[in-house]
Amino acid sequence: MDTKTHSLPITHTQLHSNSQPQSCTCTRHRQTFSQSCRQSHCGSRSRSSSQSPASHRNPTGAHSSSGHQSQSPNTSPPPKRHKKTMNSHHSPMRPTILHCSCPKNRKNLEGKLKTKKMAKRIQQVYKTKTRSS
């Protein structure tokens, strides 16, 4: 009975580890991307930073418990964890940088346009004054 029960969890965890991260990383990547976009528009960064570690801790806890049952597939999860951390770190950072830079650029561009318009007006006024006198 030990061999049957021992072989089932190994195959189950292998199927789990192979099927779960692919589907989870895709859905999580989309969720974190959409959440970070929504939250960056609102301006609340604390929610995105608190949610990404929470969603990050859940799969590691689930994988570590399954890893304790069998040590042989324990060599495959660490690279997958690294990939998850890289994806989770990159996905929130990119949208926040883009969204943060856009309003600043817009403000800077608006300010530059205003100063250019003012400079043109001043030059026109100066030209008309010199011509009239």
UniProtKB/Swiss-Prot annotation:
Pfam families, per database record: TP2
One of the GO BP terms on file: spermatogenesis
Phosphoserine: modified positions: 133
InterPro entries, per database record: TP2 (IPR000678)
Nuclear localization signal (motif): residue ranges: 111-119
One Gene Ontology term, aspect cellular component: nucleolus
Function text: Plays a key role in the replacement of histones to protamine in the elongating spermatids of mammals. In condensing spermatids, loaded onto the nucleosomes, where it promotes the recruitment and processing of protamines, which are responsible for histone eviction.
UniProt-recorded name of the protein: Nuclear transition protein 2
Gene transcribed to yield this protein: TNP2
